[in-house]
Amino acid sequence: MAPPPLPLFSPSLKAPPPPPWLHGSSTQSRDSAPPVPPLPAEATPSKFRIDSPKPAPARKNTKTAAKPLTAGVPGGRTHRAVLGIIRRVRSLELSDAPSPNSVHTSNSGAAAAAFHLTIELSPPREPGQYVVEKEKSRAVPWAAARDEGLKVALRREKKPREPTRAETELETHELRRLRRLARGIGRWARAKKAGVTDEVVKEVRREWASGEELAAVRIVEPLRRSMDRAREILEIKTGGLVVWTKGDMHFVYRGSKYQQNAKHSHTFLTNVHKDDAFQENDQSICGQKDEEPVKGTLYEREVNRLLDTLGPRFVDWWWDTPLPVDADLLPEFVPGSKTPYRLCPPGVRPTLADEELTYLRKLARLLPTHFALGRNTRLQGLAAAILKLWEKSLIAKIAVKIGIQNTNNEQMAWNLKHLTGGTVILRNKDFIILYRGKDFLPGGVAQTVIQREAQVHDEQVKEEEARLKAVDSLQMVGELSEESSLGTFREYQGFHAKFVHENTENSNTMIELEAEKYRLEKELKDHEWKLSVLNKKIERSNQALAKLHSSWSPSEQSADREHLTEEEKIMFRRIGRKMDGLVLLGRRGIFDGVIEEIHQHWKHKEVVKVITKQNQTRQIMYAASLLEVETGGILIAVEKLTTSHAIILYRGKNYRRPAKSSFSNLLTKREALRRSIEVQRRGSMKYFVRERQKSILELKRKLRYVTRQIRYRTP
């Protein structure tokens, strides 16, 4: 249970007396304390000061006003919660009983180091005394400075940047000299979409051979997305050091030990050492590298170890590590390769449902890329690597290389699907994602299942041979009678008369007619069922429209109408045609918002022009008459425009703006939209009902014709 509230202004157990100005003319306060002169209004805290009847206007800039420590935080703790925290902190401070020495020394200056929390408490009030508080007023002039010291700014901790190879290997003055030299370079090699290719490496070395210490390389998409990865690739392939990066430019230093006439080997472009191309994070159990820290998480090390077993890595990968396997370096043909054996578990549907497909696509988004592919055919080596990967992972994620000509992701996906038997769950210009399928069997399990099925087949063959031998060994109990027709010509004649028609052409025609009759009957039944479904939908739509129409009651036209002369109608018609302001009658039709907008136009103008996109004359005239009745105006004309019609309405000479702004007898905007959707839906369903009825009549006609043909050919 929390301790009772204690004053937080002093570390002593005895509460200090309240300020004398809070007790007014009390005798007890005069006896207990000497008279204190009243404080000026500027020094009196706003919490304790009685404001004048006309308070000063509040400042507009409330950002500089100091808030008390116990004020509620928007979206955080409330005032009561902060008070509870302070009580607990205060109880911890008072839990240790102070010794006499400590109390004595506290008066000499140690009390300044005690833990104090300033909190604004409501002062005690006497009967008849009231305090007028301002909501957004500062407490005292020094409150802002006092609260400023209590604020604690927690900055986001920045991740320390790892130094580059050039920063660790070169001296500081040498690095500065090279960067100053790089600012004057005007030529550069361009690493295109294919990345840092052999041509780029040759151009960099050609620049070094000409006597230059630095060579500039401009990086383009997609390698520009990760300039750190581009720097690593350049340092691996060229053997130099990237001393400076500016925008999309890398400046490569040839090194202090560069030999101009040395022959450089290009074998590392296809077989890069593992320590340079990617970091192998697993440690030796024997203890040779115990002093080196383990880099990367367990998942990253397992992924790297798995990809190492599949093939060489793709060094020009434009994303972060782990580097995918270069599928173009895998063998094109594998001897004895074939589509793997598959077997779906009993009671499991082999196809994927929509929810499963969505889940697999979301799962593939987080997985690293396993392969990078740049050719369309000869993918047997890649298929074998995918089958090996599927033993550890459900999904194989393949990236299509950028910058290689004649790549066709559709052909790649088709070949991989037929070589592996998997399911393509995603295919676009960047990625191909293959799911191993529910019927996938790992290599060892597949061989076991095949062997077991072969054993079962052999046992069945042996059982059949044994059964045939037993049947042959049995002797017939009775001989065939002389009157038997088995195997005789009479048996052949009876079979021919019973089952074979005399006219073969006629029998084939009858079979075709029977098949056509069966097809027509089935199709007619399907059409009738679909027609019944459409009729039920139309009935539900009619019920929804009836419910909407029940909440709408059109107004009655007034009997006392104004009459305009022909000259006035012609004048208002010209004015309406030249007007720029208009009211657009959309798909919702006429609802309360349209009537309100018309009255807003009539507030300043006598004529309003309403534009409607309807095509049928009956609908246009109905809308014009309904607007005339609901607004109380006078219909001047209905004009034909280029792609629409204009309805011109005059407000009348005795026009008065309606008292109420909402029209309860009309539909709201939301109800009008629902009505429009239901009307459009019902119209489309009626169209399909007519088309379905025509199809049913045509099928019945064909069925009658086929039935007559069968009846005519039947003997």
From Swiss-Prot:
Comp. bias (Pro residues)? 1-21
A single GO BP: mRNA processing
One of its Pfam families is CRS1_YhbY
Q: Name one GO molecular function term.
A: mRNA binding
Q: How does it assemble?
A: Homodimer. Interacts with RNA, specifically with atpF intron. Part of large ribonucleo-protein complexes that include group IIA introns and CRS1.
Query: What superkingdom does the record give?
Result: Eukaryota
Q: Per UniProt, what is the name of the gene that codes for the protein in this document?
A: CRS1
The reply on keyword Chloroplast is yes
- Tissue specificity note: More expressed in leaves than in roots.
Coiled-coil regions listed in the entry: 448-473, 502-550
Q: How does activity depend on pH?
A: Optimum pH is 7-7.5.
Q: Name the species this protein comes from.
A: Zea mays (Maize)
Please report the name of this protein according to its UniProt entry.
Chloroplastic group IIA intron splicing facilitator CRS1, chloroplastic
Predominant cellular place of this UniProt entry's protein: plastid
Q: What does this protein do?
A: Required for the splicing of group IIA introns in chloroplasts, and especially for atpF, by regulating the intron folding. Forms splicing particles with RNA. Also involved in chloroplast protein translation.
Q: Which parts of this chain are annotated as the region Disordered? A: 1-76
In its keyword annotation, does this UniProt entry include Transit peptide?
yes
Protein keywords: Chloroplast, Coiled coil, mRNA processing, mRNA splicing, Plastid, Repeat, Ribonucleoprotein, RNA-binding, Transit peptide, Translation regulation
Domain CRM spans what residues? 168-265, 350-447, 562-662
Q: How does activity depend on temperature?
A: Optimum temperature is 25-30 degrees Celsius.
Compartment(s) = Plastid, Chloroplast stroma
Q: Which GO terms describe its cellular component?
A: chloroplast stroma; ribonucleoprotein complex
Signal peptide per UniProt: none
Q: Which Gene3D superfamilies match?
A: YhbY-like
TM ranges:
none
InterPro entries reported in the protein's UniProt record:
CRS1/CFM2/CFM3, RNA-binding_CRM, YhbY-like_sf
